[in-house]
Each structure stands twice: as C-alpha cells, then as structure tokens.
Curated annotation (Swiss-Prot):
CDD domains: PUA_Cbf5 (cd21148)
Species this chain originates from: Saccharolobus solfataricus (strain ATCC 35092 / DSM 1617 / JCM 11322 / P2)
Biological processes per GO annotation: box H/ACA sno(s)RNA 3'-end processing; mRNA pseudouridine synthesis; rRNA pseudouridine synthesis; snRNA pseudouridine synthesis; tRNA processing
Protein's UniProt name: Probable tRNA pseudouridine synthase B
Catalytic activity field: uridine(55) in tRNA = pseudouridine(55) in tRNA
Function of the molecule: Could be responsible for synthesis of pseudouridine from uracil-55 in the psi GC loop of transfer RNAs.
Keyword vocabulary terms for this entry: Isomerase, tRNA processing
Cross-referenced Gene3D superfamilies: Pseudouridine synthase, PUA domain
SMART domains named in the record: PUA
GO molecular function: pseudouridine synthase activity; RNA binding; tRNA pseudouridine(55) synthase activity
InterPro entries: PsdUridine_synth_cat_dom_sf, PsdUridine_synth_N, PUA, PUA-like_sf, PUA_sf, tRNA_PsdUridine_synth_B_fam, TruB_C, Uncharacterised_CHP00451
Superkingdom of the source species: Archaea
Organism classification: Archaea, Thermoproteota, Thermoprotei, Sulfolobales, Sulfolobaceae
Length: 251
C-alpha cells in the first residue's frame, strides 16, 4: 500500500508518510521453536521499543524510539511465522524480526513483507492496481468517460481526515493563496486543537487551502478578537481562484 500524490497533492504527502502503518510479514525463525514461548516474546514487543535502523537503510543509524501499537500472530507453520503489526512510521519490520530472533536465542529474519495500511489509507478500501489506473486513463482519453478516473483518484482533502480543521471566509482565501497569514477575523468555524498542532485550513466548500501549525489553542481562539491563528507551512489553493478581497494602499 503506497499512497501517491500527483500535481498539487504532492505537497501533502509528507503528512501522510508520518501516519501510522500496518504490515503483514513472514518471519523465519532459525531453529525449531516452542509456540507458547515465542508468542510470549513477540507480545513483549508491544509498546515502545528501541530500534537502530539496519545497515542497508535510507536514514542515519541512530538509536530511536518507536511504538508498536499491536502485534498479532496470524499463523505458524514449521519455522515460518505470519505477523500483523500496527506501528509508528519509520519502524523497520526486518529489524523487528531480527530482534525477536535475538531474544528467543537462535535468530530470525524477515522473509516477506506487505504494507496494508499507510495513515488513513488501507489496502481494503483505497488500493488501486496499476492496470486499473491505466484503464481509467484510457476510458477518459478515448471515450470521454471519467467515471473510473474519479473512482481511482481521491481528492487531496481526504488526506486531512485526521488533522484538526479550520474553516475560513471566502474573502480570506485568496489572501492566504498569496502568502498572507490567517488572522482571527477570517475564521468561520474550527475543530478542537492545541497550540503547535498541525491543522488544515479549508474553504466553506471544504476545499483545502493550506496546512500549518496552530499559534494558539482552539479555546484561546474562541475569545480572541485579533491575532494570527496559524503559521502556514504549505499552501495548496491556486491564486485568483477566489476573488481578491483586499485593497492596495494608495501611495
């Protein structure tokens, strides 16, 4: 399961990549094992663990903390163990299998790996095969039928489902598209959030305008009359889609 962004949606992929992951992997144990003893060791990895990335990895090999939210044994067959793991982003399954083998005493390694969830995107509901995408593009280009294309392409707003949202006035949209900061008077509605939380800024129609870090709590915003609400980090709305609502100062 690999979410892919195209055009403007590539800007939001950083938020998706930081979401939790679910993997199904095959671990091979290097000796005959007692099922109950191995199951007990595997379950002990649930919670916070220390991991140092493998030698062959794309990041620096620094010791770091990752959380295993759930680890489940799906099947055991001879020396093979089928696992389902829900974990933080950046958790290495091959290192997890290696560490389980060390604790058991005879070693283990990962044989196969499949990612079944990335953030809010799951294999059961969002997975699209390449041939399906190819067929959808063919139907759109040659038959002017966009039904399949709309099925396989998901609006980028979907990626903000787990991010607190702030809805703004239409009059503030173009100002933000030009780089202005979001001030209190431009806010129409909002969900609960804390200072420094990542928030998504939407139009009244639900279109994604920008994302950024909150400069105040939602409780503080409730009574505020002025001030900057969000420090914008990514702007998605194209300029001049919404009309300008500010005037230039006369010289």
């Amino acid at each position: 399961m690999l979410p892919i962004g195209i055009e403007n949606a590539t800007k939001i992929m950083n938020y998706i990549s930081k979401g939790g992951k679910e993997y199904v992997c095959v671990m091979q144990v290097h000796c005959e094992y007692n099922k109950e003893e191995l199951a007990k060791i595997i379950s002990s990895f649930k919670g916070e663990i220390y991991q140092r990335p493998p030698v062959r990895s794309s990041v620096k090999r620094r010791l770091r903390i990752r959380r295993i939210y759930d680890i489940e044994i799906l099947d055991m067959d001879k020396k093979l163990v089928l696992l389902r793991v829900n974990c933080d982003s950046g958790t290495y399954m091959r290192k997890l299998c290696h560490d389980i083998g060390i604790i058991y005493g005879c070693g283990a390694h990962m044989r196969e790996l499949r990612r079944t969830r990335s953030g809010i995107f799951t294999e059961s509901t969002n997975l699209v095969k390449l041939h399906e995408l190819s067929e959808a593009i063919y139907l759109y280009k040659n038959c002017k039928d966009e039904t399949e294309l709309r099925r396989v392409l998901i609006p980028m707003e979907f990626a903000t489902c787990e991010i607190p949202k702030i809805v703004i006035e239409d009059s503030a949209v173009n100002a933000l598209a030009y780089g202005a900061q979001l001030a209190v008077p431009g806010v129409v509605a909002y969900q609960n959030f804390k200072k420094n939380d990542t928030v998504a800024v939407l139009t009244l129609k639900g279109e994604l305008v920008a994302t950024g870090n909150a400069l105040m709590d939602s409780e503080e915003l409730e009574n505020a009359k002025k001030g900057i609400v969000v420090n914008l980090s990514r702007v998605f709305m194209q300029r001049d889609i919404y009309p300008k609502a500010w005037k230039k100062h006369e010289s």
